[in-house]
């Protein structure tokens, strides 16, 4: 039995609320159970120096957690003077996941910066961030379309992410913190709307896992991501 009493293939309650920030070109408040992330997408008429003059744009991401997003206060990374390795890893993952599904040439010489701020953490902050980031990005692209700033189809597909793991010997979908901290294996899957794989991160925490177990986790992830993509489409409709 899972601590949350969910079925092995059951997501936490998920909501994707678009357009929650007044000033941002795109925004989304994403909730995976008790994990809440505020995502904004900002359009900027600037590019990294190495991209200037190439006729295409860029999408990048930043990630951070509020000090009391967790059970005990975490020191702000700004006050420490540097980002943690975990933060750098996650924001790079978010950025490259989004870049796989956007037509950078259609974007023009502009940059969209996606900021993911974790308001409350209960496991799966990176997967919630990626799923909400697509909604914020789509919101920003629609803002641009309404102003005739882009003509071609900028977004080629959806992108969403979910965690899976082996808990008490059973493959389960969408781990919360209680499960993640006790799982024998945990993995994160990032996929497109049509089921193609962008990234797989898998780790054996207590004992190695088999190929069959990995495939079982992937099957759960595909099922969960299909549901998330449906929710994304409803959010931006």
From Swiss-Prot:
GO terms for molecular function: 3'-5'-RNA exonuclease activity; RNA binding; tRNA binding; tRNA nucleotidyltransferase activity. It holds the Pfam family RNase_PH. It comes from Bradyrhizobium diazoefficiens (strain JCM 10833 / BCRC 13528 / IAM 13628 / NBRC 14792 / USDA 110). This is Ribonuclease PH. The keyword RNA-binding applies. Phosphate binds at residues 86, 124-126. Belongs to the RNase PH family. Homohexameric ring arranged as a trimer of dimers. Phosphorolytic 3'-5' exoribonuclease that plays an important role in tRNA 3'-end maturation. Removes nucleotide residues following the 3'-CCA terminus of tRNAs; can also add nucleotides to the ends of RNA molecules by using nucleoside diphosphates as substrates, but this may not be physiologically important. Probably plays a role in initiation of 16S rRNA degradation (leading to ribosome degradation) during starvation. Its EC number is 2.7.7.56. Keywords: Nucleotidyltransferase, RNA-binding, rRNA processing, Transferase, tRNA processing, tRNA-binding. Coiled coil: none annotated. Transmembrane segments: none annotated. GO terms for biological process: rRNA catabolic process; rRNA processing; tRNA processing. The keyword tRNA-binding applies. It is an enzyme of class 2 (transferase). It catalyses: tRNA(n+1) + phosphate = tRNA(n) + a ribonucleoside 5'-diphosphate.
